[in-house]
Amino acid sequence: MAVAPDGPVGAAFLDEVRMRHPRLRLQAVSARFVLSETHAKKILALSVESDRLGILLANRIETDILMRFALTSQISVAIRDAGIGPSSRDIFILIAMGTARDLVLLHKDLEPLLTEPFASDRAPFLKRKFHITHRAIDATASSAPLEDILVERAAVLGASIRPPPSA
């Protein structure tokens, strides 16, 4: 769900929502880093599968999700770039995992702040931020090449920080 704060919210907002909904796993990602709904679903699938296999990029799945959207293996960089800052007024995507009942309660709680998540085109920002060239997009045989490049880069993050399997 996309949240449009009516004033500066920052990390305190996320902490408050976590206190009101302790059974949910929550992470806020700057809307600029989420290309589309399918991009978000693919990144979440990567994190959930990594959690299942015990190969998260960080100790918590919430942090793993943020790192994959930010395309970095550094937690501090992910928080700085793709997280919500202490006085942020930017729209952010709130990723929530839990039971259907708890998710409905969260939706009701945040309903006045919800907005259209993909109203603006984030492709130019993402191409610039992650140095994705027109040539790379043209070389990708896909109906959504930018999305696939972003997801592929998020998937290989784990390979760059995990030790090789022992023989």
Predicted regions and their residues:
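Conserved NTP-handling cores and scaffolds of large molecular machines
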Residues: H21-R25, A82, P86, L114
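Ordered, amphipathic secondary-structure segments that act as subunit-interaction surfaces
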Residues: K41-M97
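Helical mechanochemical/support elements of P-loop NTPase systems and associated helical scaffolds
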Residues: V9-F13, L71-Q74, D102
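Glycine-rich, aromatic-bearing surface loops/beta-hairpins
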Residues: G85-A167
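Generic detector of well-ordered alpha-helical segments enriched in charged/polar residues
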Residues: L14, R18, L44, S76-I79, ...
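N-terminal interaction modules that seed assembly of large macromolecular complexes
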Residues: A2-E62
